[in-house]
Amino acid sequence: MSIISEHGFRMDGRRPAQIRNINTRLGLNRNAEGSCYLEHGNTKVLCAVYGPYESKASKRLEDRCAIVCQYSTTTFSGLERKNRPRGDRKSTEISRLLEKAFESVILTESFPRSQIDIFCEVIQGDGSNLAACVNATSLALADAGIPMKGIASAATCGIVETKPIVDLTSREETDLLPRVTLATICGRDEVILVELQNRLHIDHLSVVMDAAKATCADVYECLAVVAQQHLKACAPILGN
């Protein structure tokens, strides 16, 4: 089956530039400083943030806060059952990508000699998993009251022949489309994460990057509304 039909629709009924619905709930994990449950279409992610707290000597940075991320997936999260939901090569790679991205977002110099732990778990994966984790982490950090440069937003975009498609599903990803996962701050041009999957012709790179940046801006608008509403809801409680 073609990824884009002759009438211009994808397999799930979306247009090429249309993102899936985003639903969130903040503060579900009362043991964490901040948490977020995010549904991006059928992709479902839980994120919990702990800290800042005094770090161990082995991870202590004198001038800033250390960011430690752990990415994992449930054994039933994808199309295939997984025997090692965390600690495998791919999970470790994504954990490092998240760390580097949020080192650029969090005002780490505000908490020298301390550490912030971020745990992301994909409960159900239906494509754009890394992007969903970035978006959930941004809201979990906002829930925790961690000072940031702004809210980070992310999107995964691919290309079919010469046409970009945004917010890929797992079915679209399994077709081995060239794709880019991009994250920016406040939906602007400050890029904090780029991951390229499969070979992408240099002539198509700018097309995919432009589509990804535009999609990050759309996602940011959704996340910003959630963060603002959550802040308003918490304001009376903080005032007391």
Swiss-Prot record:
Keyword annotations from UniProtKB, A to Z: Cytoplasm, Exosome, Nucleus, RNA-binding, rRNA processing
CC annotations in GO: cytoplasmic exosome (RNase complex); nuclear exosome (RNase complex); nucleolus; nucleoplasm
InterPro entries attached to this UniProt entry: ExoRNase_PH_dom1, ExoRNase_PH_dom2, ExoRNase_PH_dom2_sf, PNPase/RNase_PH_dom_sf, Ribosomal_Su5_D2-typ_SF, RNase_PH, RNase_PH_CS
Entry superkingdom: Eukaryota
Pfam annotation, one family: RNase_PH
Organism in which the protein naturally occurs: Caenorhabditis briggsae
Protein name: Putative exosome complex component RRP41
Function (record text): Non-catalytic component of the RNA exosome complex which has 3'->5' exoribonuclease activity and participates in a multitude of cellular RNA processing and degradation events.
